[in-house]
Amino acid sequence: MGLGHSKAHPRVIKVTPLQSQETETPSTGPVFFALNRNLEEESSFTRLQDQNRTREGQLPPLRETWYGRLPAVSRAMYLDIPLKHEETSIIKRHPPRRIQKLEPIDLPQAITSERLLCHQEGRTKSNTKQENEKKIQLPMYTSGKRQYLHKMKMLEMNHKRQEAQMELRKSLLSKAMLDMQKLKDHNGNKIAQSKPRSNGYDILTILPNENINRDPGNPQDEEFLDCHTENDYYVRKIGKMETWLREQEARGQLFWDSSSSDSDELEKDERRPQALVRTKTEKIPLYDDFYDSA
């Protein structure tokens, strides 16, 4: 019964798809609409032919299976074909996102009782450590070092004491000099006031060595002579004091010019008696043998 020759070979009819009369304009974007439309037209045309042949009693021709090459169900295909000369790498056209550094948000931390206790314990521990270190450092000084420190303190105290004494002496000396100047000015004013005022007569300067003619019973002459002797005495006394001070400064015996800072020398200078100034008082004789005897 030949099974192989009983089947009729179907005739394959080549079908050309109908071209649309409208000329399609090339689009700048990706081309996928025209391709999808052609596939739909081909599938509809083949279905109509198959239906007509089944009505006539003939089997439809074998169709080429596009399994693995095209999908069985027609769907829209997206072919990203760049029309311009651009970069074809997908990574360059769609670069990946850069790695971003995420910083933590500074939120206020809730202070709990445990944290407070930890802080207090840390503070107390640090304070106790510092106190222990101080206690350990105290007995580390040796006896020699203690003696040296004590000696340095005593020397510093003596130096301060000597400076205070020097300042006190300088102030006392300046005060004494001011008093002497005031006394000198006062005596000069006294001498100027004690001069007799002349009513158109010439004023005679009286020297202490001169012998003055006077009447023994004239009290005005006696007062005039006494006043002049006192004034001359004060002037001579002040002049001698100034000369003595200048001599002492020239010799370098005054304490503010000395460069020694030893306390023993200062005590010796204090105990040393001051030099006395001898002043002569020349008295004018009130009675003259030659003139008064006549």
UniProtKB/Swiss-Prot annotation:
Cystine bridges: none
Lipid-modified residues, N-myristoyl glycine kind: G2
Domain of life: Eukaryota
Cellular location(s): Cell membrane; Cytoplasmic vesicle
Residue ranges, compositional bias (Basic and acidic residues): 268-279
One Gene Ontology term, aspect cellular component: cytoplasmic vesicle
The keyword Nucleotide-binding is assigned to this record: no
Region: Disordered, residue numbers: 1-28, 255-279
Main location: membrane
Effect seen on changing G2A: Affects the subcellular localization. Detected in the nucleus
UniProt keyword list: Cell membrane, Cytoplasmic vesicle, Lipoprotein, Membrane, Myristate
Transmembrane helix among keywords: no
Biased segments, Basic residues type: 1-12
Topology in membrane: Peripheral membrane protein
Protein name: Factor associated with metabolism and energy
Protein source organism: Mus musculus (Mouse)
Gene that specifies this protein: Ccdc198
